[in-house]
């Protein structure tokens, strides 16, 4: 069984030679995490009419094969978050991806870090759900190699939902 306990994973992305984004494993119960989750929930509610909280709990991040991360700017301020949690032994689900858009490239930095971490944890596929109406998210995932799949799990039969998958190589 893979455990991230004791691992010090850290990725730094430098954009345009100026902006630094650091992504690392974090505490989903921290005040920084809570603040970003609330910002994400408000944004989702404004876009879709649903804050997305019903399909995610921070408690789920206690699983050995789950991971919660924060992205921080060069001043150390949390500007984005994301998570993976197990669906099966080989498939993880991408959850609560968010950037406050104060720094360009946060979404890409988070996604790259989570995909690389998922591979290290033994996952071979990542899945996710978003809403058709969330055009930015749909476009972002397509641009990053995710393909449309049949709705799975709690999203089966939900016409407002769209699901994506990516094989990790």
Protein language model features and the residues they cover:
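Active-site-proximal flexible loops/turns
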Residues: 102-103, 136
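C-terminal "cap" of GNAT-fold acetyltransferases
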Residues: 21, 29, 69, 124-127, ...
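Conserved N-terminal entry element of GNAT/NAT acetyltransferase domains
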Residues: 2-31, 169
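Intrinsically disordered, low-complexity boundary segments flanking structured domains
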Residues: 8-15, 55-58, 151
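Alpha-helical macromolecular-interaction surfaces
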Residues: 109, 113, 135-136
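Acetyl-CoA-dependent GNAT
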Residues: 21-95, 99-102, 111-112, 117, ...
């Amino acid at each position: 069984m893979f455990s991230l306990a004791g691992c010090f994973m850290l990725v730094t992305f430098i954009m345009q030679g100026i902006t630094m984004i650091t992504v690392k494993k974090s505490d989903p119960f921290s005040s920084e995490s809570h603040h970003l989750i609330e910002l994400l929930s408000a944004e989702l509610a404004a876009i879709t009419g649903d804050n997305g909280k019903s399909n995610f709990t921070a408690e789920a991040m206690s699983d050995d094969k789950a991971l919660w991360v924060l992205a921080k700017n060069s001043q150390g301020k949390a500007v984005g978050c994301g998570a993976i949690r197990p669906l099966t032994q080989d498939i993880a689900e991408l959850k609560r991806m968010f950037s406050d858009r104060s720094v360009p490239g946060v979404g890409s930095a988070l996604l790259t870090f989570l995909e690389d971490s998922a591979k290290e944890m033994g996952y071979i596929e990542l899945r996710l759900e978003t809403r058709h109406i969330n055009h930015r998210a749909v476009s972002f995932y397509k641009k990053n190699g995710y393909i449309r799949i049949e709705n799975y799990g709690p999203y089966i039969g939900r016409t407002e939902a769209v699901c994506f998958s990516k094989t990790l190589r």
